[in-house]
Regions:
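N-terminal beta1-alpha1 cap of cysteine-dependent amidohydrolase-like domains
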Residues: 1-90, 97-104, 109-135, 141-164, ...
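Beta-strand-turn-beta hairpins that frame and shape the catalytic cleft
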Residues: 170-176
């Protein structure tokens, strides 16, 4: 979850968009938020028992070391325990960096506060969704392109105009972003 500074207080707080609990409730998932301030993320995840994890969006990789560190620990836990992981926007970016990829500054205003079409380029995803393209919302200031994908990452959704990667999976792992 995103880390914010509470107005009129000298403290950090974890925050998540209300869209997440509403969506997860609709699909009848139990929701447990993982605090960014835990000293042992792996013990916490083992204690609660998880069958899927989400790295949510909001803010940029590198904006808050505490969040970056927590999400790297979550990612390591997911890989070690073969737990499916979904990375959305910032979550996708930190996963790409974890696998030795990079992110770059977005110079295309069509990605910020807009919806746009992405093309699906993986036959398994096309078969699953029964379509060749999707309209997605977009709020990211940083992007992943075909030239800066990490090791073992395979894109499945890409924009027409600037070849921004909007979805990828890890070749050896149940990870979808």
């Amino acid at each position: 979850s995103r880390i914010i500074n509470a107005e009129n207080y000298d403290e950090k707080r974890d925050a998540i968009s209300h869209d997440w609990p509403q969506l997860l409730e609709k699909i009848e998932s139990n929701i447990i938020f993982i605090p960014n301030s835990l000293t042992n993320v792996e013990d916490f995840l083992n204690d609660i028992g998880v069958n899927g994890l989400i790295l949510s969006g909001g803010d940029n990789v590198g904006d808050d070391k505490e969040r970056d560190d927590t999400e790297i620990k979550i990612l390591n836990f997911a890989i070690k325990n073969q737990i499916p992981l979904l990375g959305v926007c910032r979550g996708m970016q930190i996963i790409n960096k974890f696998f030795s990829g990079s992110i770059e500054k977005n110079n295309n205003s069509s990605h910020v506060g807009n919806s746009h079409v992405v093309n699906l380029i993986n036959n398994n995803i096309i078969s699953l969704l029964k379509k060749n393209s999707l309209e997605v919302n977009s709020f990211h200031n940083n992007i992943i392109t075909t030239s800066n994908l990490g090791k073992n990452i395979e894109s499945f959704a890409i924009t027409d105009n600037d070849k921004t990667i909007e979805g990828f999976s890890i070749r050896f792992f149940q990870l979808l972003v």
